[in-house]
Amino acid sequence: IVATGAHAASPHAIPGETKLAFGDAVVMDFGARYAGYCSDMTRTVFVGEPSDEARRAYGAIRRANEECEAMLRAGLSGADVHQHAEAVLEEEGFGGAMGHSLGHSVGIDIHEAPNLSPRNPKALCAGNVVTVEPGIYLTGKFGMRLEDYGVVRDTSYEVFTQSTHEMIIIS
């Protein structure tokens, strides 16, 4: 998925005719397949200086991503982690703007169970490979997402994604 501007306000945007504009967020969701297994990551970059609202939104998804990754461990439910992300976005002024589950498992298929979702009360297990992908989608304005994937351990979450969480502005 590559989407920009108001078109990016759809989490699973399909190709369109939207042209890049100064200040736009560009959402890039991609992965690879190796030995039959999938990877998944998303980064959002900006073409020129983003608006104050877009800066605040990016800070909110970054905070939600990093706090959820720091809390993830075996024994928590997918709902526990999802609810934490929603609470962070609410505190940052973007409550209700995520519109999708916080994450999903990745394996032979790109979307597998267990999910980091309000509908998953089951405990995560060590060895589950899951994404953490908070997003904010404001209809008619912009969308953005910050997604990593990694493995749940007994007492932590080991991130596989090797890419910065810093805001990237392309001049």
Ranges and model annotations:
Residues 1-171:
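Active-site neighborhoods and metal-handling regions in enzymes and metal-associated proteins
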